[in-house]
From Swiss-Prot:
Pfam families: Glyco_hydro_39, Glyco_hydro_39_C. Alpha-D-mannopyranose binds at P53, L55, H57, W305. The gene is IDUA. This is Alpha-L-iduronidase. It is found in: Lysosome. Detected in testis (at protein level). Expressed ubiquitously. GO terms for molecular function: L-iduronidase activity.
């Protein structure tokens, strides 16, 4: 499969990016990027999501292990280049059952937890492992010394089990964390006083340490309202800073990271402002924690995941998520504390949407529970916010100097137009120099259908390299919104196969084919960005070798005549990819390419008009220079009905 031939840069950009009406009254923004001027490391601190199963939590397995969630996690894990790495999950310990035998003490059944963690690992994801829940309601009071000791043994047993199952190198990457939001007192049937919470914390800490000192543990994962509110949050910090360890009697208890929850109330900058105020107070009260990593592992723009909001359906949400990331990497000068760059920033948006709001809840995918087929089945669509995570994944580890100005005035990241830019130095023959410039146009939760922002982007300092090319990817509502297509189709409750095909055609950004980069090392693009929108410029030198092989190809059933293919790019070795070529063979002998738009997402729904899906599949990467990599190992698929039994919606209204 070969990328389309290069076109004149001006005409190509007009075709792809100037579809918006001209913003006659607006002065243009000027974006300058210097590829020769690296500022600092750019860590991908945003690669996390999360969700909560519904009540009753003792039946969390019905949600966590449901077919719907298996599909959802396939989508989450299919973000290219590890663009989402962690799924922070509430009530994990409710997946364990406990039994007490005379003379034997407590014994545990880990079958459901094994299944969920296996599912994450299959999708190359890590758990954000909250030590939350009471197996079979055996733990009720953490001021009871016997229960505290038993809890330590449970945590140690759990950690040893998964070190043995997966290896320490994998489990040591997990973020073990306290019970979620302890000051909200969602403990189900567990009595949790301040002292009980501190005893619980020490039992978790020492249980993990007994399994391996390499395991990471932090908390408290809550709002940290100013004292005297949030007593468990502040009490835990006081305990870890000055208190006595329940088990060892030593002063001070380890706290590997401080996790807090600050959401935006509809504002991007409000997230950062709250974080800065809280962290400044923590560092003032507890100076030993000045260098302790800070996580905001629920940093959503708005509380209430199930609350339907039109902006959550389309590129408005996607652009706002990118804007929040940029504000954390480049804090506005007026906000002072530039030292606060969180070690982790997570959106809590891996929930499953439910009827009648498939697109407008705080989710990465849109779920349709299609009940007019026999048997009923589930379909997911990729929302623009999930595609935005794929664009963020194209950023690399060296942040470049970049500046946005308008009318001669330099603008910080708390404005409508912003930028993140990065560069990468090669690490092998399948790798080469590259640079990424990611522009956002975002007015937070507000969309302006008739407004476009004129922008001039100037990139300079690009070094000479073999086969140097550039590619643009644009994400906006007119062309890249499955929700918009759904509305144009009349908002069908049970879309047909053809309607799903039309909605999926809007999932990917609009890609302009690779073009030669100017020999001068400078490039100027004049564009008009829809408000909201994202625009990514990717500049790549040609590696010595073509891409490596696609691995882990799987086929998952959806319904008659439709199959989901998902694969891994872990051995592909290059980010400068134009598409994945997917080939199908009904007889396992003669393979033909499947016709589709260019896409580098590691997932594809095959839904041919012929409805013939039984056969063999293979996939290979194609780079910007039209060089294919090796095919994956083929996978053979025989059509079978997908599992049924859709899960209930989650109950966590304030998440």
């Amino acid at each position: 499969m070969r990328p389309p031939g290069p076109r004149a840069p001006g005409l190509a950009l007009l075709a792809a990016l100037l579809a918006a009406p001209r913003a006659l009254a607006e002065a243009p923004h000027l974006v300058l990027v210097d590829a020769a001027r690296a500022l600092r490391p750019l860590r991908p601190f945003w690669r996390s999501t999360g969700f909560c199963p519904p009540l009753p939590h003792s039946q969390a397995d019905r949600y966590d292990l449901s077919w719907d969630q298996q599909l959802n996690l396939a989508y989450v894990g299919a973000v290219p280049h590890g663009g989402i790495e962690q799924v922070r999950t509430h009530w994990l310990l409710e997946l364990i059952t406990a039994r007490e035998s005379a003379g034997q003490g407590l014994s545990y059944n880990f079958t459901h937890l094994d299944g969920y963690l296996d599912l994450l690992r299959e999708n190359q994801l890590l758990p954000g492992f909250e030590l939350m829940g009471s197996p079979s309601q055996r733990f009720t009071d953490f001021e009871d010394k016997r229960q505290v000791l038993a809890w330590k043994e449970l945590v140690s047993l759990l950690a040893r089990r998964y070190i043995g199952r997966y290896g320490l190198s994998y489990v040591s990457k997990w973020n073990f964390e306290t019970w979620n939001e302890p000051d909200h007192h969602d403990f189900d049937n567990v009595t949790m006083t301040l002292q009980g919470f501190l005893n619980y914390y020490d039992a978790c800490s020492e249980g993990l340490r007994a399994a391996s000192p390499a395991l990471r543990f932090g908390g408290p994962g809550d709002s940290f309202h100013p004292w005297p509110r949030s007593p468990l949050c502040w009490g835990l910090l006081e305990h870890c800073h000055n208190g006595t360890n329940f088990f060892t009697g030593e002063l001070g208890v380890r706290l590997d990271y401080i996790s807090l929850h600050k959401k935006g109330a509809g504002s991007s900058i409000y997230i950062l402002e709250q974080e800065q105020a809280t962290v400044q107070q923590i560092r003032r009260l507890f100076p030993k924690f000045a260098d302790t990593p800070v996580y905001n592992d629920e940093a959503d723009p708005l509380v209430g995941w199930a609350l339907p909001q039109p902006w959550r359906a389309d590129v408005t949400y996607a652009a706002m998520v990118v804007k929040v990331v940029a504000q954390h990497q480049n804090p506005p000068r007026a906000n002072g504390s530039a030292a606060l760059r969180p070690a982790l920033l997570s959106n809590d948006n891996a929930f499953l949407s439910f009827h009648p709001h498939p697109f407008t809840q705080r989710t990465l995918t849109a779920r349709f529970q299609v009940n007019d087929t026999e048997p009923p089945h589930v379909q997911l669509l990729r929302k623009p916010v999930l595609t935005a995570m794929a664009l963020l994944a194209l950023l690399d580890g060296r942040q470049l100097w970049a500046e946005v100005s308008r009318g001669g005035t330099v603008l910080d990241s708390n404005h409508t137009v912003g930028v993140l830019a990065s560069a990468h130095l090669p690490a092998g023959p399948r790798d080469a120099w590259r640079a990424t410039v990611l522009l956002y146009a975002s007015d937070d939760t507000r969309a302006h259908a008739a407004r476009a922002v004129p922008v001039t982007l100037r990139l300079l300092g690009v070094p000479r390299g073999p086969g140097l090319v550039y590619v643009t990817l644009a994400l906006d509502n007119p062309r890249c919104s499955p929700h918009g297509e759904w509305q144009r189709l009349g908002r069908p409750v049970f879309p047909t196969a053809e309607e799903f095909r039309r909605m999926r055609a809007a999932e990917d950004p609009v890609a302009e084919a690779p073009r030669p980069f100017p020999a001068s090392g400078r490039l100027t693009l004049s564009v008009e960005l829809r408000l909201p929108s994202l625009l990514l410029l990717h500049v790549c030198a040609r590696p010595e070798k073509p891409p490596g092989p696609v691995t882990r190809l799987r086929a998952l059933p959806l319904t008659r005549g439709q199959v989901l293919l998902v694969w891994s790019d872990e051995r592909v070795g290059s980010k400068c990819l134009w598409t994945y070529e997917i080939q199908f063979s009904a007889d396992g002998e003669v393979y033909t390419p499947i016709s589709r738009k260019p896409s580098t997402f590691n997932l594809f729904v095959f839904s041919p008009e012929s409805a013939v899906t039984s056969g063999s599949y293979r996939v290979r990467a194609v780079d910007y220079w039209a060089r294919p990599g090796p095919f994956s190992t083929r996978v053979h698929y025989v059509e079978v009905p997908a599992p049924s039994g859709p899960p209930r919606p989650s109950d966590c209204e304030r998440c």
